[in-house]
């Protein structure tokens, strides 16, 4: 039985983004339960917030099928360890943060033994592998969703879900400060910039760097004063990008940045980016964007048959309309990319009006998902802990 003042709260995060969410949630929960104890699998931020960790979170942070297969015995051993520890400790609640392939099985086992379970960050069940919703229903007392269309999806299947808003929408100002962004990046704010984000994964850089760079070459001919900002997540991606650039666009001058994608998109007039979280971040930065994506032909063939949504980018999914161009596979070629970006760079009255209208829509969508997500998530945990789960709106 839970002692109201000092619940035992378990959390498992599997990567950096989950560690950030976990730390925000722990700090918000402490306002409700100053004497709570937090255990689980934590990264540095969660540990700093006061979470005891069973092992280094890095052990769960594997990407891609090949890596998962390679580390599967270790992952299964760690999952068994987490389940056994939780069954022994009997936390008042277990919160799996993202990492659904790891966490949903843990949640299902714990819920079956009478431990309340929450899954924080909905897997993309609304887009593909929709049959997973049955497992999520069995595994959880509540799903915490970043986006309103995710809650609408769970409502269709009668799975308890609460929309809490997006932490990124809380972190970015409704009116981003371009002067500040330029100063942070040591850029001349009188210049014109285009941000180019080729993705954080090696496969994304491999497929997108060439068409994105060639599109930049076309735009440079049309707009000689245009400069290019290329934020990359780490040294590996920088080296990979520079190698491709040396082959396809050796003469093109670009500003390569380590990190700082957000500042780059705020400083730039427009962005060319890979689908994914970057598109949501670009929308919150009020950056007119073109979304481009390429993958292996076989992967694309499969994805076309599996993906159930009309759009691939989060701004379009949120708006439920084609707000920003999505150029996928063969359409993601330099000429198309440059043409659509040209609409954002042209300086006539019609194009200026279109850009302002787009930014206004971005602001409306920003407000829709700016809900103080840490506090909302904490309140949802409190409600489940105290069994007040009748209203999950």
Curated annotation (Swiss-Prot):
Enzyme Commission number(s) from the entry: 2.4.1.182
InterPro entries, A to Z: Glyco_trans_19
Substrates-to-products reaction catalysed: a lipid X + a UDP-2-N,3-O-bis[(3R)-3-hydroxyacyl]-alpha-D-glucosamine = a lipid A disaccharide + UDP + H(+)
Keywords annotated in UniProt: Glycosyltransferase, Lipid A biosynthesis, Lipid biosynthesis, Lipid metabolism, Transferase
Keyword Oxidoreductase among record annotations: no
NCBIfam families given in the database record: lpxB (TIGR00215)
Organism, scientific name: Actinobacillus pleuropneumoniae serotype 3 (strain JL03)
Name recorded for this polypeptide: Lipid-A-disaccharide synthase
């Amino acid at each position: 039985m839970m002692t109201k003042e000092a619940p035992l709260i378990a959390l498992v995060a599997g990567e950096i983004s989950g560690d950030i969410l976990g730390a925000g949630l722990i700090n918000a929960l402490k306002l409700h339960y100053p004497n709570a104890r937090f255990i689980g699998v934590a990264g540095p931020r969660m540990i700093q917030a006061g979470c005891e960790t069973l092992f280094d979170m890095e052990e769960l942070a594997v990407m891609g099928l090949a890596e998962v297969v390679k580390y599967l015995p270790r992952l299964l051993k760690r999952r068994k360890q987490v389940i056994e520890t939780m069954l022994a400790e009997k936390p008042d609640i277990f919160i799996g943060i993202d990492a659904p392939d790891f966490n949903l099985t843990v949640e299902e086992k714990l819920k079956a033994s009478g431990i309340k379970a929450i899954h924080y960050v909905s897997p993309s069940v609304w887009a593909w592998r929709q049959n997973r919703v049955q497992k999520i229903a069995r595994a959880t007392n509540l799903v915490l969703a970043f986006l309103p269309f995710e809650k609408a999806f769970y409502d269709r299947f009668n799975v308890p879900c609460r929309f809490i808003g997006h932490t990124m929408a809380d972190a970015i100002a409704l009116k981003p400060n371009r002067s500040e962004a330029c100063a942070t990046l040591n850029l001349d704010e009188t210049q014109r910039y285009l941000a180019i984000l080729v993705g954080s994964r090696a496969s994304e850089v491999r497929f997108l760097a060439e068409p994105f760079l060639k599109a930049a070459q076309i735009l440079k001919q049309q707009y000689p004063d245009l400069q290019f900002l290329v934020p990359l997540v780490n040294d590996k991606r920088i080296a990979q990008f520079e190698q491709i650039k040396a082959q396809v666009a050796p003469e093109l001058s670009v500003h390569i940045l380590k990190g700082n994608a957000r500042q780059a998109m705020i400083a730039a007039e427009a962005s060319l980016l890979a689908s994914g979280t970057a598109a949501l971040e670009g929308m919150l930065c009020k950056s007119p964007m073109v979304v481009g994506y390429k993958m292996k032909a076989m992967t694309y063939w499969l994805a076309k048959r599996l993906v159930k949504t009309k759009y691939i980018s989060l701004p379009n999914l949120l708006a439920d309309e084609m707000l920003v161009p999505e150029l996928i596979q063969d359409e993601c070629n330099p000429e198309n990319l440059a043409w659509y970006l040209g609409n954002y760079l042209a300086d006539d009255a019609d194009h200026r009006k279109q850009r302002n209208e787009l930014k206004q829509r971005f602001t409306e969508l920003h407000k829709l998902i700016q809900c103080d997500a840490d506090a909302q998530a904490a309140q949802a945990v409190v409600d489940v802990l105290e069994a007040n789960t009748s209203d999950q709106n």
